[in-house]
Amino acid sequence: MYQDKILVRQLGLQPYEPISQAMHEFTDTRDDSTLDEIWLVEHYPVFTQGQAGKAEHILMPGDIPVIQSDRGGQVTYHGPGQQVMYVLLNLKRRKLGVRELVTLLEQTVVNTLAELGIEAHPRADAPGVYVGEKKICSLGLRIRRGCSFHGLALNVNMDLSPFLRINPCGYAGMEMAKISQWKPEATTNNIAPRLLENILALLNNPDFEYITA
């Protein structure tokens, strides 16, 4: 019988492409008995272009590589100091629709930021989480065979300047924010556990096993 348990992998700082490839392989080979997984990772500097991404939104990438991704959404930036959380969930088994998963991920971030005294909100016209008009978390998913992969990227204490080289998520002039603007002591090390606790709460507190790379 299937046990509701999630494997949580803390992967540290990693290049984007091998992690993306591993996500695909996991999703392609999983079956109904495979445990769901959540991967916590930071990436070396990279722009990723979503499936519907338009080249004109990449203004001047310079020395930062641009990699095509099959997630939803437009171009975004990943770099050290940004907490990425990939959600490898069997949606059918969890009785979750895609829209419900998006809402759950946004609420995970809103709840995490609320614990820090930062008031944040999602936007109906542009997926992600915002503080005022500034975007603090990007979101992009792919569903294959009823299972999700990709996830969210929360700006913690990263260098935001590379976002100026693109139209983030396809919005010209979109301003970005990071947690350390309000909480200078914030790091991915102290934000990741909060993020994990909040998503597990919204998934009805399944058992989980923590695995470090």
Curated annotation (Swiss-Prot):
GO terms for biological process: lipoate biosynthetic process; lipoate metabolic process; negative regulation of gene expression; protein modification process. The keyword Transferase applies. Pathway: Protein modification; protein lipoylation via endogenous pathway; protein N(6)-(lipoyl)lysine from octanoyl-[acyl-carrier-protein]: step 1/2. It is an enzyme of class 2 (transferase). Coiled coil: none annotated. One of its GO terms (molecular function) is catalytic activity. It catalyses: octanoyl-[ACP] + L-lysyl-[protein] = N(6)-octanoyl-L-lysyl-[protein] + holo-[ACP] + H(+). Disulfide bonds: none annotated. InterPro entries: aa-tRNA-synth_II/BPL/LPL (IPR045864), BPL_LPL_catalytic (IPR004143), Octanoyltransferase (IPR000544), Octanoyltransferase_CS (IPR020605). Its main location: cytoplasm. Gene3D superfamilies: Bira Bifunctional Protein, Domain 2. It holds the Pfam family LplA-B_cat. It is found in: Cytoplasm. SUPFAM superfamilies: Class II aaRS and biotin synthetases (SSF55681). Substrate binds at residues 71-78, 138-140, 151-153. Its EC number is 2.3.1.181. Optimum pH is about 7.5. The keyword Cytoplasm applies. GO terms for cellular component: cytoplasm. Residues 32-207 form the BPL/LPL catalytic domain. The record marks 135 as: Lowers pKa of active site Cys. Belongs to the LipB family. Catalyzes the transfer of endogenously produced octanoic acid from octanoyl-acyl-carrier-protein onto the lipoyl domains of lipoate-dependent enzymes. Lipoyl-ACP can also act as a substrate although octanoyl-ACP is likely to be the physiological substrate. Monomer or homotrimer. Both forms are active. In the reaction, the free carboxyl group of octanoic acid is attached via an amide linkage to the epsilon-amino group of a specific lysine residue of lipoyl domains of lipoate-dependent enzymes. This is Octanoyltransferase.
